[in-house]
C-alpha cells in the first residue's frame, strides 16, 4: 500500500477537552504549577493564569502585569470558589440565593456564558415565585378587593414599555387560522407577562377582572381555542389569569401533546424548532435586576404566609392532586416553545367597561386589520395602555397612601425625588465608564468596585483595620501608625474615604444609607448630609442661584448647571468624528481624541510612564505604594490635593522654604499641555 498517495489523515480525541480540564483541576487542587494567587477577603486561591484568562476577559487584561498576587474586593470567597469550579470543570453547584452574587461577579469578570445562564435562571425563578405567590393569595382569600385589582392593573400598566418593543404579534393581512407563534419571546416575563401580543394579554386580563367584579368571582375562559396549563384546578378567583399568562415559562405537558403540535402550525414549524433549541430569550438587564431584587423581597415578605410544601403525590386541601415542584432550583435552561394565540380582532364588551368605569374609548371593537398599516406601529397599543395606566394609577392612589412606589418593581421610597433617582436603575443607562478598559456601569459604586480589579497589583500586605493594601511590609507598618494615638483615622469600608473622627464617619455613612435628616429652613427640603444642605443654601443667598434638581449642587450661571445636569440625564451632545463615541462634556471629548492621536501628555516623575489624562495619572501614582499626586519638597510628605499641599506649606517656617521654590515642584507628574 503506497502511503504517499493517501490524503491527509485526521486524528481526533473527542474526550481531550474534558480530560484537559479534569487534569488542570487536579493540578490546581494539588497546587502543582500554579502561577497566580488570587486573594479574596484574606483567603488565598492558587490557580493557573492561563485557565483564568481563557475563562474571564477581565483576568486576561489583569494578567498582562506579570504579577503573581492579585486582590479582588468585589466578591466573597464563596462566590470566587464557585467561579473557580466553573472555570476548571465547566459546571458549578449553587443555591438560588447565590445567583445574584454570581451574576454580579460574572458581569465584572466578563464571563459571558455564566452571566447569560444566571440571567435566565433568575427569570425562571421569578416566574415560578410569581405563580406560587398567586396560589398563596388564592388560598388565603383575605386580601382586599381593591388591592387585588390594583395589582393586576399594575402588571398591565408595566407591560406598556415591553409592548412598544415587541410590536404587533398580528398585523393586517396576517390573521392565520389557528394559533400563531409570537416573534418576541425575549420580552421580560418577570412581572407575569406572556410572550403573546401585549395588547391581547392586557385586554384579556381586563375582561376577566371586569367579570369578577360583576359576578363576584373570576371564571376560567370558555371555548375550545383557549388552551390552559397542565396542573390546573387552582382557585378561580385569582390564579386563572396568572396561569394563562405564564404559559411561556412552562414546559409543555405530556398529557397535552396538542399544545406542542399547535405551536408549529401555520407554516412556521422550522422557526419554532430553532427557537426551541436556543431556549428562552435572554432577558433585559433591568428586568433581571428587578427579578433578583423582587426574589429576595418576595421571600422575606411572604415567609410567614407560604405554607410548607406538600409531599409528592399529596394534594393540598381543596386542590386536585398533582406532583409537587422540585425542592431546589438548578442551573438548567428550559427549552420552551411559546404557543399563544394572537387574534387580529380584539373586542371589549361594554358591560365589562361599565363595571370597571373605563372611558368609552375602550368600549369598542378594535379590528387592527382595518387600519391597513396607516397608523404608526405601536400607536394603538400606546393609546390603549395610556387609558389602562390612568385606571391603574387611580386604583393605586386609593390603596396606597404612604410614601411613593416605583411603578417598575413596586419598591416603596420616601418621596418622589427618591423614586426618580431609583428609576434610573431600571432604565439600564450605564453612565459611569471605566477609563482603563471602557466597561460601563449603572452607578458609581459598581464602577469603584470594578476599579479595584485594575488597581489590585502585587499587594500582599493588608491592613486589618481598614483593608488598605501594600506591597511592602514597612509601608504597611507606616500606615498602621495612622490608626493609633490622637491622629487616628477612620475609613469608610464602602468607598474608602478617610475621616479623622468617628462622628464624621457616622455622618458620612448616612449618605450611603439614604438617611435624610437635614432640613432647609427656607424651603423645608431634606438632605442626606450637612454638606449637601450647605451646598443647597447657596441657592437662597444669591451667590449660586442655579441649583441642580437631581443632587442639589448650586452654580453661578445657567450654562454651568446645564453641563452638570448631563451627568444625571445621560445627555451626550459631543460626538467624536473618528469613532462616533459621545460625551457629556467638551473636555471629555478633547481627552478622548488622544486615543486616536496617541498623545500622552502626562508623565510620572517616579517611573516616567505616560498617561492620556489627569485622572489616569492619579490612578497610576497610587501604584507607587499609594502615593498621592503631590509631595512636599521640604519634608517629603504626600498630599492628596493641591489645596491640601498649599495648607501644608503654610506649616513650614519661611526660612525653610528655598527662594526658588514653586508649587509646581510638588507635582509628582509632568504635564505637557
UniProtKB/Swiss-Prot annotation:
Biological pathway: Protein modification; protein ubiquitination
Modified residues (Phosphothreonine): 282
Biased composition (Basic and acidic residues): 293-302, 319-331
Domain of life: Eukaryota
Upregulating conditions: By retinoic acid.
Annotated site (Breakpoint for translocation to form PLZF-RAR-alpha oncogene): 394-395
Subcellular location: Nucleus; Nucleus, Nuclear body
Pfam families: BTB (PF00651), zf-C2H2 (PF00096), zf-C2H2_6 (PF13912)
Gene Ontology terms: cellular component: cytosol; male germ cell nucleus; nuclear body; nuclear speck; nucleus; PML body; protein-containing complex; transcription repressor complex
Gene3D superfamilies: Classic Zinc Finger, Potassium Channel Kv1.1, Chain A
UniProt xrefs under SUPFAM superfamilies: beta-beta-alpha zinc fingers, POZ domain
Zinc finger intervals, C2H2-type: 404-426, 432-454, 461-483, 490-512, 518-540, 546-568, 574-596, 602-624, 630-652
GO molecular function list: DNA binding; DNA-binding transcription activator activity, RNA polymerase II-specific; DNA-binding transcription repressor activity, RNA polymerase II-specific; identical protein binding; protein domain specific binding; protein homodimerization activity; RNA polymerase II cis-regulatory region sequence-specific DNA binding; transcription corepressor binding
Associated pathology: Skeletal defects, genital hypoplasia, and impaired intellectual development: A disorder characterized by intellectual disability, craniofacial dysmorphism, microcephaly and short stature. Additional features include absence of the thumbs, hypoplasia of the radii and ulnae, additional vertebrae and ribs, retarded bone age and genital hypoplasia. A chromosomal aberration involving ZBTB16 may be a cause of acute promyelocytic leukemia (APL). Translocation t(11;17)(q32;q21) with RARA.
Biological role: Acts as a transcriptional repressor. Transcriptional repression may be mediated through recruitment of histone deacetylases to target promoters. May play a role in myeloid maturation and in the development and/or maintenance of other differentiated tissues. Probable substrate-recognition component of an E3 ubiquitin-protein ligase complex which mediates the ubiquitination and subsequent proteasomal degradation of target proteins.
Family membership noted in the UniProt record: Belongs to the krueppel C2H2-type zinc-finger protein family.
Protein's UniProt name: Zinc finger and BTB domain-containing protein 16
Gene: ZBTB16
Amino acid at each position: 500500500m503506497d502511503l504517499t498517495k493517501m490524503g491527509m489523515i485526521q486524528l481526533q480525541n473527542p474526550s481531550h477537552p474534558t480530560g484537559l480540564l479534569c487534569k488542570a483541576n487536579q493540578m490546581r487542587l494539588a497546587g502543582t504549577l500554579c502561577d497566580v494567587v488570587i486573594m479574596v477577603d484574606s483567603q488565598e486561591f492558587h490557580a493557573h493564569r492561563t485557565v483564568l484568562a481563557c475563562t474571564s476577559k477581565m483576568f486576561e487584561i489583569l494578567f498582562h502585569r506579570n504579577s503573581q498576587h492579585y486582590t479582588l474586593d468585589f466578591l466573597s470567597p464563596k462566590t470566587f470558589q464557585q467561579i473557580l469550579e466553573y472555570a476548571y470543570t465547566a459546571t458549578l453547584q449553587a443555591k438560588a440565593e447565590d445567583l445574584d452574587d454570581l451574576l454580579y461577579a460574572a458581569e465584572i469578570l466578563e464571563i459571558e456564558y455564566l452571566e447569560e445562564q444566571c440571567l435566565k435562571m433568575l427569570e425562571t425563578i421569578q416566574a415560578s415565585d410569581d405563580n406560587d405567590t398567586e396560589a398563596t393569595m388564592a388560598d388565603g382569600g383575605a386580601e382586599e378587593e381593591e388591592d387585588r385589582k390594583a395589582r393586576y392593573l399594575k402588571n398591565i400598566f408595566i407591560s406598556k414599555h415591553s409592548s412598544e418593543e415587541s410590536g404587533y404579534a398580528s398585523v393586517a393581512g396576517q390573521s392565520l387560522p389557528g394559533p400563531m407563534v409570537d416573534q418576541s419571546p425575549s420580552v421580560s416575563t418577570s412581572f407575569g407577562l406572556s410572550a403573546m401580543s401585549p395588547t391581547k394579554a392586557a385586554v384579556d386580563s381586563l375582561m376577566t377582572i371586569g367579570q369578577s367584579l360583576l359576578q363576584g368571582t373570576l371564571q376560567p375562559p370558555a371555548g375550545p381555542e383557549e388552551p390552559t396549563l397542565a396542573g390546573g384546578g387552582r382557585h378561580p378567583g385569582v390564579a386563572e389569569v396568572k396561569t394563562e399568562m405564564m404559559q411561556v415559562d412552562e414546559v409543555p405537558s405530556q398529557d397535552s401533546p396538542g399544545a406542542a403540535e399547535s405551536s408549529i402550525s401555520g407554516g412556521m414549524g422550522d422557526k419554532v424548532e430553532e427557537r426551541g433549541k436556543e431556549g428562552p430569550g435572554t432577558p433585559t438587564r433591568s428586568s433581571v435586576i428587578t427579578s433578583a431584587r423582587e426574589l429576595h423581597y418576595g421571600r422575606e415578605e411572604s415567609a410567614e404566609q407560604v405554607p410548607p410544601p406538600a409531599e409528592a403525590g399529596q394534594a393540598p386541601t381543596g386542590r386536585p392532586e398533582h406532583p409537587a415542584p422540585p425542592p431546589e432550583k438548578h442551573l438548567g435552561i428550559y427549552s420552551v416553545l411559546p404557543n399563544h394565540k394572537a387574534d387580529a380582532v380584539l373586542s371589549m364588551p361594554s358591560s365589562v367597561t361599565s363595571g370597571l368605569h373605563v372611558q368609552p374609548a375602550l368600549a369598542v371593537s378594535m379590528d387592527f386589520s382595518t387600519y391597513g398599516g396607516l397608523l404608526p406601529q405601536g400607536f394603538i397599543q400606546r393609546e390603549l395602555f395610556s387609558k389602562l395606566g390612568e385606571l391603574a394609577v387611580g386604583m393605586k392612589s386609593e390603596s396606597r397612601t404612604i410614601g411613593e412606589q416605583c411603578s417598575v418593581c413596586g419598591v416603596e421610597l420616601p418621596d418622589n425625588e427618591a423614586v426618580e433617582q431609583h428609576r434610573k436603575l431600571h432604565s439600564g443607562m450605564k453612565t459611569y465608564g471605566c477609563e482603563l478598559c471602557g466597561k460601563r456601569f449603572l452607578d458609581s459604586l459598581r464602577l469603584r468596585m470594578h476599579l479595584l480589579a485594575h488597581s489590585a497589583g502585587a499587594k500582599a500586605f493588608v491592613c486589618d483595620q481598614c483593608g488598605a493594601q501594600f506591597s511592602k511590609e514597612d509601608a504597611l507598618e507606616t500606615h498602621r501608625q495612622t490608626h493609633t494615638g490622637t491622629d487616628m483615622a477612620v475609613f469608610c469600608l464602602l468607598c474608602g474615604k478617610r475621616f479623622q473622627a468617628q462622628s464624621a464617619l457616622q455622618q458620612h455613612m448616612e449618605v450611603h444609607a439614604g438617611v435624610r435628616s437635614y432640613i432647609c429652613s427656607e424651603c423645608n427640603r431634606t438632605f442626606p448630609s450637612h454638606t449637601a444642605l450647605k451646598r443647597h443654601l447657596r441657592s437662597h443667598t444669591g451667590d449660586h442661584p442655579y441649583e441642580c434638581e437631581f443632587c442639589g449642587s448650586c452654580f453661578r450661571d445657567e450654562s454651568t448647571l446645564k453641563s452638570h445636569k448631563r451627568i444625571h440625564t445621560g445627555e451626550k451632545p459631543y460626538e467624536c468624528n473618528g469613532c462616533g463615541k459621545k460625551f457629556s462634556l467638551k473636555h471629555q471629548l478633547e481627552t478622548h481624541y488622544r486615543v486616536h492621536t496617541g498623545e500622552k501628555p502626562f508623565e510620572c516623575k517616579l517611573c516616567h510612564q505616560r498617561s492620556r489624562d489627569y485622572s489616569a495619572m492619579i490612578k497610576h501614582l497610587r501604584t507607587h505604594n499609594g502615593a498621592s499626586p503631590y509631595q512636599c519638597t521640604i519634608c517629603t510628605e504626600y498630599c492628596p490635593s493641591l489645596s491640601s499641599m498649599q495648607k501644608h506649606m503654610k506649616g513650614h517656617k519661611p526660612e525653610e522654604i528655598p527662594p526658588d521654590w514653586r508649587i509646581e515642584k510638588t507635582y509628582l507628574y509632568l504635564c505637557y499641555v
